[in-house]
Amino acid sequence: MSIVALIRDARADEAFALEALQRRASDVWEEYRAQLAAHPDAITPPHQAIAEGRVRVAVDAAGRRLGFSTVLPVHDRRCELDDLFVEPEWMRRGVGRVLVHDLATRAHTAGASYVDVIANPNALGFYTRLGFHVTDETSTRFGAAPRMTLALPRSATRPEPR
């Protein structure tokens, strides 16, 4: 049974709360703490993405935010997962998986055949378990990162973990 009771669109009044969630989730990776502290502009409130309906929030039965995802618009049958962050105490409990399933369903409905992500190297196993595969490596402001792709089945609405 999932701890996620609902996935909903983010509201404008929670942009700063989502920014704080992203900071807490990012701080679990010790190797990025100093870089994020030196570049606080790397994490900003997702005002524009919220206004465009591209941010989804997973909440529990009490309405607490457990995590969120941000996607870029579908272009050329591809959708890019731009952000996926889960509260540290809820990591490894299915929240990220449920958010990816939600975005895959929505991307498929919007006409996408693929979901792309530039993955944190620490999350490579997570994405691989959901069916993503490495297609390339790219540079980010914090170093090299794998570019990964998930092919969306034509008839299925969401990926299943392997």
Predicted regions and their residues:
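Conserved GNAT acetyl-CoA-binding A-motif
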Residues: 107-120
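Glycine-rich ATP-lid loops
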Residues: 88, 92, 112
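Conserved N-terminal entry element of GNAT/NAT acetyltransferase domains
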Residues: 1-13, 152-162
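Conserved catalytic-core motifs of GNAT/GCN5-like acyltransferases
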Residues: 116-118, 133-150
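Acetyl-CoA-dependent GNAT
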Residues: 9-83, 87-88, 100-102, 106, ...
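Conserved active-site tyrosine of GNAT-family acetyltransferases
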Residues: 127, 132
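Residues forming the Rossmann-fold NAD(P)(H) cofactor-binding site
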Residues: 93, 97, 101
